[in-house]
Amino acid sequence: MRLVTIIAAADGSALGNPGPAGWGWYVSEECWAVGGWAHATNNMAELTAVLDLLQQTAHLTDDLLVYCDSTYVINSITKWMPGWKRRGWRKGDGKAVLNVEIMKALDEAMRGRRVRFEWVKGHSGHVLNEAADRLANAAAASWKDDTVPSPGPGFAGAVVRHPESRPGQVVDEPDLFSA
């Protein structure tokens, strides 16, 4: 039996943070996806890029290696999530976990999967990360211009698209940035 690992990069961008935001993941020129919102944070975008990648590869049994320049994403999934779950999705200080709906979806998407995350320094020339960064920035720029970006080809055979990346769908998160 041959073992295969899907190698991808995921990234997010927010112009103004919060502001127009985009996310993107990249495997190859034929296999990538983007999405975003008119108003969100970079962390929401970073998390959603990974979530969409996990959902679009859920029908496969292959291992997944995700390059990511966000330590927040990597630590959330690999270190902090078990404690948050034990505490009812609360942090150690008792405060609610931010982006909890995305975190819960990530927890579900990770279940039974063999996924490894590797941190890469952003804007350091890592080919896959640079491609994901370009996609995320282009998606955020589209939202800034009030246009919905083309979602990209996605992963062959994927049956799920992340619904929160569609216009008007992200309403569950509190507005932490208004006065």
Give the positions of each predicted feature.
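Acidic, His- and aromatic-enriched active-site or binding-groove loops in soluble protein domains
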Residues: 137-152
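A short, charged, Gly/Pro-tolerant segment at domain boundaries
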Residues: 150-162
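Alpha-helical transmembrane segments that form the membrane-embedded catalytic/substrate-binding core
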Residues: 46, 132-137
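RNase H-like nuclease fold core
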Residues: 1-48, 55-58, 62, 141-142, ...
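RNase H catalytic domain
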Residues: 7-9, 13-20, 51-131
